[in-house]
Amino acid sequence: MAREINIGDRVAIFATVGKRIEDRVTLHILTANNPYSIIDPKAKPGDRLRFEGDVVFVDEETDRVTVQVLGRVTVEASTVELVRKFERPTYVLS
């Protein structure tokens, strides 16, 4: 894996708006194998949208990550943008 992405990290996924069907638009997410759609009355075909979510699974053998955004989306790790590394909470015992 080129950069280290771990469970709990906040990442961004980019999608391109496809065709419009009434108030919904289809989304094309690079390297995702499933179709997605959202309700967005202002999006036009060709627009690029950014979605942020947390990594819930990392498959190091196939270099893919699953992100909790639009449900769960599995994409190649090289197509996500790291927003924030996960930091464990620190507890102070008194």
Locate each region found by the language model:
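Low-complexity, intrinsically disordered short peptide segments enriched in small/polar/basic residues
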Residues: A2-E4, R10, F14, R72, ...
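OB-fold and OB-like single-stranded nucleic-acid-recognition modules
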Residues: R3, T16-G18, P89-S94
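Short coil-to-beta-strand transition motifs
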Residues: N6-F14, P45-E52
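Short strand-coil-strand connectors
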Residues: F14, H28-A32, Q68-L70
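Short, conserved beta-turn/loop elements at beta-strand boundaries and strand-helix junctions
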Residues: G18-V25, V58-R64
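Short, structured interface segments
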Residues: R20-P41
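Intrinsically disordered, low-complexity, charged/polar segments
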Residues: P35-S94
